[in-house]
């Protein structure tokens, strides 16, 4: 990398002292430093705070992007040492995707990797010993003076699933969707205890110890115990009463649909590589997508046999490795932190000699001149992996069938998405009087949101989740000759192929 021979890249991208004139104050700037000052809102801070509470003293609680307060403590030498240690082919995973010339790819990798010797790299995972009792943490978040901080706190209630298997972690992923859905006993208990509060449930599988988080926002610091008790009450009700099989099957189907539609991403190669690499880094396995696909199918048989209840009881309700972290906005703390930094920099300048001040001033001017230069053309050319002429021109021709039966026109086409179907249904409103069109729009909007003669509202929601990846019904128009349009009610849905049978 260029920063091995050009320290100014570290100063530009990480941080540096800046002095615009001999009488001006010293400031700190840098691309990452400036970005991270604006990147952390109270919700992101609350997540890191909960991690610090549940994983005391661990790197898991660190901000991977860099804490603005800590970034200026990073030295150029530390960056080089970190890169030499961990950015090594022995600690790398290469993912190839697409219609590639594998021979050319392997030659390129061999020419690069052959310069290195294989070595064992000890990568700390940040894991901690399971806690024997729940813990609590309180953290302050800086906001401007005069800010309204009432109902501005964020409460995180987390559980660490120590010893959970790959299958159980996948099950917790499904379970969190259930717990955050409308009608779940946990959500109902929280809404009753804290009316108007925001509520979410999530699972973090990015570390060796999986974490499940219940979060409330729009609350006060004093609501922490109320929130914890409400979550526990809801979990106890779920363990006592069990889970709705249809609802679980719906959530599993939604997960299967999402997995199958991953190929629809415009950045499918990078998306797959990132997903595979993230699971490899945690599990040491490369088969996550296949594993998850088969596991979701197996979960259907467990939906009505108490397996999800056992997960909730073992890893949530009766789990001692849990904790509550309260992140509280403090008005005026932002200005205080800025004033403290300005004072430290002023003290630093006061301790400098005139020679040191002039040296920093000259360094600032030299840096501005250097960074204004354009990159050499030779460097730009060296970064080009392919030429424009080598890029393929891909024109995909999708055969379309157009048939009419009994006055109904059917258009069908095949896609390259395995196991998923899309249906669009246009119902003409030609014979509906103009004054009644708004009623058609209203009725369409209510489709799937009300009970029927045979199903309750909850059952309709569960079946929709199970069989429909997405659903829309509403008014639309079809252009005809000239300025004329035909009003229609358009129904559109996406589902898995086996559910079309």
For each of these PLM feature ranges, what is it?
Residues 33, 37, 43-45, 51-52, ...:
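His/Glu-based metal-binding/catalytic segments typifying zinc-dependent metallopeptidases
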Residues 106-122:
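Glycine-centered hinge/linker elements that transmit conformational signals in sensory
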Residues 62, 84-90, 148-151, 205-210, ...:
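Short, flexible turn/loop "capping" segments at secondary-structure junctions
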Residues 155-246, 406-411, 415, 421-481:
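Structured mid-domain segments that build the active-site/substrate or prosthetic-cofactor binding neighborhood
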Residues 36-43, 48-93, 162, 221-222, ...:
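Histidine-acidic residue clusters that define the catalytic metal-binding segment
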Residues 91-95, 154, 211-213, 322-324, ...:
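Beta-sheet entry/capping signal
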